[in-house]
Amino acid sequence: MCVSFGDLGAENKHFNTNPVRSFRLVLRVLDSTLREGELFRLYPSDVRVRVASRLADSGLKRVELTVDYPPRTSFGDVVPVVKALRDRGVEVVMHGRACEEDIEAIRRYKADGCALYIAVSKLHREYKLHGVSEDEVIERLCTAVRVARDSGFGYIRATLEDSSRIYLEDGEEGLPRIANSIQRLKESGATIVSLPDTSGLLTPRLARDFFARASAFSPLPLAAHFHNDYGLATANTIEAALEGAEEVHATLLGIGDRNGIADTYELVATLEDIHGVRTGLNRSSLRELYEYFSRVTGIEIPWRHPLSREARTVRAGVHQSMTVKRKEGYIPSRKLENDFGEPLYAISPYVSHNLVQTIITPHTGTIDKEKTRRIAESLATVTRDGATPPSLDAVQEIIRNETGVMIPRQELARYFGGERVYILLKLHPQFPAQRLVKEAMEWEGVEGVDEVYGEADMVIRAHITYGKGSVVSLLRQKFPDALQDLKVLVTD
């Protein structure tokens, strides 16, 4: 059966104005951190299993893995990850080429589904597939889908790689060809079709139009997979979701080939917090998931990411002055509720005297505006000309000099955050260092652990807040017999 462009419907000439188009109860998020994400960085086997478990614990119900390609990867590398996911009720989708060899490899894992891809654009067909015709690549994909169907897979995703280029280059003429391809794939047994923006060419307006049109003519659910070459992957994926895509692809921190794809947090938080779209994830678990992933992989959360320490930090004095009264004035209330709890404040030349007043009044019992201003000016002076912000000890001293009150560092950390430190450990020679490494990487505040040689055996990079659950107190509590010496160096 062929689908003519006339069958697509006149309504496709206009953008859909409905903010959420014909949604099922829950939008399905497919996390590809352990497939697409491993194009950015390969993880050790034990890390992959731990990350898989955390993905499941956050509520993700569909996770994508790559079929093994010996000798670079092996069956034994992938099996423990599949088991960790399936034991937690996660649907495992194995990604491979549209060929019988890869389908046979996928069968061995007893995965729930398979994702089969082939390039369809003229550029890719000519230079990657050696000049084969569009009809031939679709027939190859249909053949692979039929093999997957006969193998008993319940989920079969057919990926028309680089399909956005057809839409961009061929416009109206390209859409009927995509419609034809989807119809052939449906008849072959595909359960969902992915229309990826393989080279990150689309903008949100174009992504919205592409998926509005495709959703109208597609007899199969659509998956959205956008690359981030212009920094628009998450925005494009959101637009596709609002126009009817039933599966959206993302990774933690958006990692993937080149500069990645949509970011799981940015995608889920925006859809849930702003558009009211349910994704099935535990929204409030995402910050912990990201911090854990950063610790065990060594991939830092960038400063401009919505879950970074910087995203939580209010810098402008007038902003600080309002935020101490109504914190949602500058940080979205759903982010405070689910991610941060409370804002942090930067000590800079712009520090607010109202912030200082909020900190000291519970301890002084009175409001002395002149002293408050002098404290604020002293803090501002310390950071003038780009100097490093003062330590919490220095802040304590500045306040004490004006008020005679010593405010606990733990209390100051509530406003200014903990301090970034290097913790140098000297261990007893017989103690198994990996035991400490493995446990410390699970602790909140730890950024990384390195074994070293010299005066110390191990260096822990961390943020400490001086409470009972700080990294230093946990080390002394849990490993008293392992430590010969412990030193803390505060950094900026």
Predicted regions and their residues:
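A mid-to-C-terminal "edge-of-domain" accessory segment
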Residues: S4-F23, L27, T33-R35, V277-Y415
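Short hydrophobic alpha-helical runs that function as membrane-insertion/retention elements
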Residues: E91, A115, S194, E247-A250
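N-terminal active-site wall of soluble small-molecule enzyme domains
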Residues: Y69-D87, V92-A105
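Active-site-proximal loop/turn and secondary-structure-junction residues that shape catalytic pockets
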Residues: V67-T73, G96-E100, I118-K122, L160-S164, ...
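Catalytic alpha/beta core domains of metabolic enzymes, predominantly
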Residues: T198-S321
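Alpha/beta enzyme core
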Residues: F5, P19, L27-V29, E36-V63, ...
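A compositional/biophysical signature of low hydrophobicity enriched in polar/charged and small residues
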Residues: G404-D492
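Divalent metal-dependent hydrolysis catalytic cores, especially in the metallo-beta-lactamase
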Residues: L60-D68, E247-V248
